[in-house]
């Protein structure tokens, strides 16, 4: 558990319903396909290698970060979200930093993620760079929707 300015970051598994409710307060809620949404979110929250949650003084969820890792070489950030009213306060950076630390540290781990255009400045600010060496196998047609 990490105490920060008015919030705590800890390893915590959320229930699917908690995460879905949190998504309504973020800009992350438009990244998921509509197909089997609740079922797939349940799998995500239960199976991510590392699950971090930031909570404020009243225990509300204000940030979430999930990662998949082998704890030896690589880490993939699947989800990073901060409640809209808490953006710009360093919570996302703190979550990613803790995620990297738990995965094995910056000396050992290469970190990847897939982001929308609006998130690129954030990831560049924390030291990530666009890469041309990642391959993708994507044969799924998703129906876009927004969690509301």
Where are these regions (language model features)?
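Short amphipathic alpha-helix that is part of the acyltransferase structural core
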Residues: 1-35, 134, 147-148
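Conserved catalytic-core motifs of GNAT/GCN5-like acyltransferases
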Residues: 114, 124, 129-148
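A short helix-loop-beta-strand connector motif used in the catalytic cores of GNAT acetyltransferases and
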Residues: 42-53
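Conserved GNAT acetyl-CoA-binding A-motif
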Residues: 103-116
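Conserved beta-strand in the GNAT
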Residues: 53, 60-68, 74-76, 81
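Conserved acetyl-CoA pyrophosphate-binding loop and the N-cap/start of the following alpha-helix
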Residues: 86, 90-98
């Amino acid at each position: 558990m990490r105490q920060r300015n008015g919030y705590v970051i800890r390893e915590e598994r959320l229930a699917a319903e908690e995460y879905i409710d949190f998504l309504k307060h973020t800009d992350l809620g438009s990244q998921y396909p509509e197909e089997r949404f609740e079922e797939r979110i349940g799998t995500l929250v239960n199976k991510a290698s590392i699950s971090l949650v930031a909570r404020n003084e009243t225990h509300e969820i204000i940030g979430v970060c999930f990662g998949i890792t082998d704890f030896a070489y690589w880490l993939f950030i699947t989800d990073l979200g901060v409640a809209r009213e808490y953006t710009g306060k360093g919570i996302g950076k703190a979550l990613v930093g803790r995620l990297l630390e738990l995965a094995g540290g910056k000396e050992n781990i290469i970190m990847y993620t897939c982001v929308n255009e609006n998130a690129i400045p954030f990831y560049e600010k924390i030291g990530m760079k666009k890469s041309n060496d990642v391959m993708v196998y994507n044969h799924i047609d998703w129906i876009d929707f927004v969690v509301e």
